[in-house]
């Protein structure tokens, strides 16, 4: 429910959430951290995707979910993303953070995703 509620905020508040580019920059930095972690633990192979792409990609989602697998992805995302699905796109990153906020995990969000935390703070 919270996740879909987050997506309903995106259209009316698009400018506040995305327009300044700061959230996209934070997301890209995290994506590249994840790419480095995956490369390190998956035999030194660089994942065959553009980790700077902020939009959803079914191919990347399949790679993360099926080639890497969520069991390993949870470990690889630790300290980078609040959950593996947050890594799939900028919109999912926002929605996952929104969900964390509503579940009371603001401190984790503050430490791991300060830009996202400050965006969400505007709403609450």
Which residues are covered by each model-predicted region?
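Active-site-flanking segments in enzyme catalytic domains
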Residues: 1-124
């Amino acid at each position: 429910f919270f996740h879909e509620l987050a997506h309903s905020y995106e259209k009316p508040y698009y400018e506040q959430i995305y327009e300044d580019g700061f959230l996209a920059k934070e997301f890209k930095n995290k994506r590249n951290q994840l790419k480095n972690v995956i490369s390190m633990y998956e035999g030194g192979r660089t994942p065959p995707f553009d980790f700077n792409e902020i939009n959803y990609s079914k191919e990347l989602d399949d790679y993360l979910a099926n080639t890497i697998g969520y069991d390993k992805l949870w470990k690889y995302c630790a300290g980078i993303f609040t959950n593996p699905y947050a890594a799939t796109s900028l919109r999912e990153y926002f929605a996952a953070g929104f969900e964390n906020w509503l579940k009371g995990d603001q401190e984790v969000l503050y430490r791991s995703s300060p830009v996202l935390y400050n965006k969400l703070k505007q709403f609450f």
